[in-house]
Amino acid sequence: VALTATADRLTRKDIALQLRLCDPAVFIASFDRPNIRLVVRPGQKRFEQITDFLRRRPGQAGIIYCLARRTCEELAQRLNARGLRAAFYHADLPPEERSRVQDDFLYDRVPVICATVAFGMGINKSNVRFVIHYNMPQSIENYYQEIGRCGRDGLPAEALLFYSYGDVKAYREMFQKEEGCPPERAALKITKLERMYSFARSPVCRRKTVLAYFGETYDRRCGQCDICLNPPEYFDGTVIAQKALSALKRTQERVGANLLIDILRGSSRRDIMERGFHRIKTYGAGREYSFAEWSDWLSQLLHLGLLEIAYDEHHHLRITPEGYKVLFEGKPVMLAASLRSAEKPLARKKMPAERTAGELDRREALFQRLRELRRTIAVQEGVPPYVIFHDSTLQEMADRQPLSVADMLRISGVGERKWERYGMLFLLEIQQFVSGDSAENAGP
């Protein structure tokens, strides 16, 4: 018998392979923890949000997970300075100190622990009322495992997640420094990290998204996550979903998201022609929609559980059983209109005389950050910086400060090819700059 607490399809397959199991019987319990309310927020002013959260729950036991050991210590110190009793825990503490902190938490002498992710794995404390992620976890599996340490008594509990692109950058740097990690393993980690970041920014019900990730169908909205309590505008996206699923089916599910979008939009890129995808019936069936719209909708189909990523097969998209119900049985699909509502004309670019000194300073600071990002990418790829983006394009980014995919694609010099290759890196850099997230992510 092989047992595991949390495993997606790929992990289950790998377990069977490693243990040399031949056609094993697999029993999967539900991943649903209905007593845990899932809330996700951007990382701006997270310390103030956490102090407010704790003051509204005096005496309740909870864990605050941090990426860095230093952050654990500093966050606990700042909370204590605000009159909120907290301790910190990480691997650098002496064994006797770790044991003391664990006992203080178990016996309710300290209600809040600021810790790295190892804390809680061997602790049987049923009345943990909340888990806060000060930094975003590196995958949805990790997220699910860590929030599962609250509400074990079945009573209401809350999981509060803060996210930022600074977390993504920190994990990427950490993965790159790992010694002996095969390239394919590193690529898988990065893909799962990006999936986690996509989850944090998704307009789809949190519970539905998490359960879909593990292959479990949840045909309703939970009614208590941050998305359900403040829902976006929805529209009937059944035909859009059917076009995407049909096109994927006709490629024999041998493409990733970007290539699928280009097929739907009737692109004449070389690999489409060479592989004969221009001959399939759904080639160009979605040419009336932009690349950005299709990118947003495919992400939603993924979080709705209609698509999945075959991590072990070149990260190609696959249609799930629920996806086939949409394709062949006409099961309706409601999509969030988040991108459509964001597609408003960008603010008129001010002439230099109209800008304040502060605005000019900020735009220049952003321009220099974008130039530094461009230089880093150019060095990695061994190409001149202008091949990435011209200075004029970076200047327009700094002036207009686009915050959505749709806005970014309206910047002169950001075509679909450039977007596909470099766009998200620059968009996330701009988002981080505008939110003032750098300082927030550096410490508590």
State where each predicted segment sits.
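Helicase motor core with emphasis on the C-terminal RecA-like subdomain
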Residues: 1-184, 188-191, 215-220, 226-227
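Short, solvent-exposed alpha-helical surface patches in well-structured domains
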Residues: 14, 49, 74, 100, ...
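Alpha-helical scaffold segments in soluble metabolic enzymes
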Residues: 14, 49-52, 195, 209, ...
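Short polybasic/polar patches that bind polyanions
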Residues: 17, 80, 145, 201, ...
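Short alpha-helical segment immediately N-terminal to, or the first helix within
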Residues: 133, 199, 396-397
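Short, charged low-complexity linear segments at domain edges
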Residues: 184-214
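Accessory DNA-binding and partner-docking regions appended to nucleic-acid-acting proteins
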Residues: 188-190, 208, 217-444
